[in-house]
Structure formats: structure tokens, C-alpha cells
């Protein structure tokens, strides 16, 4: 058995050396090698002749090769840098097999970019992709699910097995289409995310239990007093933030609800109920 492993490793290293490329798996450098998968991704992207297309983590340029020898070759621009630290240019579409380690921050960097792009066709680790599209009641439904779906429509396009990459990752992959909601929802995202963080910190517990945590109570009381001061509202000496929290939850009929079963409309209604009583999450 050791001999077989040595022979396999030898063949892999020989191929890598022949191409002059060394891949670092710790940095998510798994190169998509199946031309049929690559072509399918390009087709599903439905790129128009006038589109500006952003690709992230081009690897061995398998996607860019599609413009070689065409009238679009002269328009190709390569930018070297950290995508999470760089200002994004204008673009219509984003088509990419991204490093999986940056999946979550990259999704929200794209969705908060202005002006809005039309949509993105991206490759993710399968479990991450399934979290993106998960619905209330699903096992994988989480803060990532609801925050992404607040800002975008998300659709699963295709599954991609790990053997389609070089070197093969330990996980399976999916291609996902993310289309920003245009116009964006009329909501303060920082306020929204503050509420969602509390609710999904323990998504299986009731909201009543989630809002009894000391850190949550302290934060809401501090924010209440700050906003009251900014609006010249006097806070009584006997003010009890816990009573106000319970009042809002009961009024919204949400005290016994659990985050894992609540949808976007449920949380928007709850956020408005808190804000109406002068309670804020930022």
C-alpha cells in the first residue's frame, strides 16, 4: 500500500512540475480542470457582449481563455491584490471559482457593492451553498441564509464533484447564482444584522430566552438611553429595559417563536416593533 501512495504522489508532482505550477491547498488553490464544467458555468452565466465581467481568483485562467482570440481579448484587465481589501470596479456580472475560505465575507462585499451588479455565478463548498439557499425549518438555515436572502435571490445551479479539481479538495462543490434585489430592501442593515445576531446565536431557543441574555439586555439598555438622549427624551429612574423587551415580544406575538422557523417578513416586523418603542441594535 505505501508503494501505491508513493506512485500516485509522484504522478501528481510530475504533472505539476511539468506545468511549472505549485498549488497551495491552504490558500484554497484547487483549480477547476474539467472543461465541460467550465463551459457549463460560462453558459449559465449568459454573458452579453456588452457586459463587464469580474472574475476572482482566476487560477490557471481557464475562464479567461474563453476570450482569447476574440474581439474581447484586448479588453481583458488583470488586477493583483486582496479582493477583500480592494475597492471593486464597476461590473455587470461576477463569474468565479473563489477560494472557499473567503466565501462569507466575499458574498457580503459583493452584495453591499454599489452600483448593483446584475448577478453573480459563483462556485462554493457544497455545505456553504446549501446554507445560502436554506429556508426556515431547514437544518442548515442560519444567519448566513436569511442575511443573504434579504439582499438577494439565490438559486442552486449545479453540483460539481471534487474530482473535477486539481488537486482535489476534501469537499464537494456547488455553483450558485446570486441576484441582488433591485431596488435593495428599505431597511437599516446594521440594525437588521444586530437583531439577527441575537436571534440566531441560539436559533433553537425561543426569542424570549435569547433576549434574556445579560449581554443583550445591557446592549439594548445602553442603546435605548443613547437614542433617548439624542431625541431629548427623558428616561425615568425606574425604567426597566427587561419589561420593555418582554412587552415588544408579546405585542409582536414573538416571545415563543424560534429563529430557525422565522422568515424575512417575521424579522422585519419584529425589528419595526422594537424600533417603534425606541429600541435599537446599533
Residue ranges of each PLM-predicted region?
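Catalytic cores of RNA-modifying enzymes
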Residues: 1-198, 269-282
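An accessory alpha-helical subdomain
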Residues: 173-174, 178-180, 184-245, 251-266, ...
Amino acid at each position: 500500500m505505501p508503494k501505491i501512495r508513493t506512485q500516485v504522489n509522484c504522478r501528481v508532482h510530475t504533472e505539476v512540475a511539468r506545468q511549472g505550477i505549485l498549488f497551495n491547498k491552504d490558500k484554497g488553490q484547487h483549480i477547476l480542470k474539467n472543461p465541460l464544467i467550465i463551459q457549463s458555468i460560462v453558459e449559465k452565466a449568459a454573458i452579453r457582449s456588452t457586459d463587464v465581467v469580474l472574475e476572482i481568483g482566476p487560477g490557471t485562467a481557464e475562464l479567461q481563455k474563453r476570450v482569447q482570440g476574440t474581439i474581447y481579448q484586448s479588453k481583458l484587465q488583470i488586477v493583483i491584490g486582496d479582493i477583500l481589501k480592494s475597492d471593486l470596479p464597476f461590473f455587470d456580472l461576477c463569474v468565479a471559482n473563489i477560494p472557499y475560505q473567503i466565501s462569507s465575507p466575499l458574498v457580503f462585499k459583493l452584495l453591499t457593492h454599489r452600483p448593483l451588479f446584475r448577478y453573480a455565478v459563483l462556485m462554493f463548498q457544497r455545505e456553504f451553498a446549501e446554507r445560502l439557499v436554506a429556508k426556515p425549518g431547514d437544518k442548515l438555515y442560519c444567519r448566513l441564509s436569511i442575511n443573504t436572502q434579504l439582499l438577494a435571490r439565490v438559486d442552486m445551479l449545479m453540483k460539481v464533484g471534487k474530482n473535477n479539481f486539481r488537486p482535489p479538495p476534501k469537499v464537494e462543490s456547488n455553483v450558485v447564482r446570486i441576484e441582488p434585489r433591485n431596488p435593495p430592501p428599505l431597511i437599516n442593515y446594521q440594525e437588521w444584522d444586530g437583531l439577527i445576531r441575537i436571534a440566531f446565536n441560539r436559533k433553537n431557543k425561543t426569542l424570549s430566552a435569547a433576549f434574556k441574555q445579560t449581554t443583550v439586555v445591557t446592549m439594548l439598555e445602553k442603546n435605548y438611553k443613547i437614542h433617548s438622549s439624542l431625541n431629548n427624551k427623558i428616561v425615568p429612574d425606574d425604567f426597566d429595559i427587561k419589561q420593555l423587551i418582554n412587552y415588544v415580544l408579546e405585542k409582536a406575538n414573538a416571545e415563543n417563536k424560534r429563529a430557525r422557523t422565522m422568515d424575512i417578513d417575521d424579522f422585519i416586523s419584529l425589528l419595526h416593533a422594537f424600533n417603534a418603542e425606541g429600541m435599537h441594535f446599533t
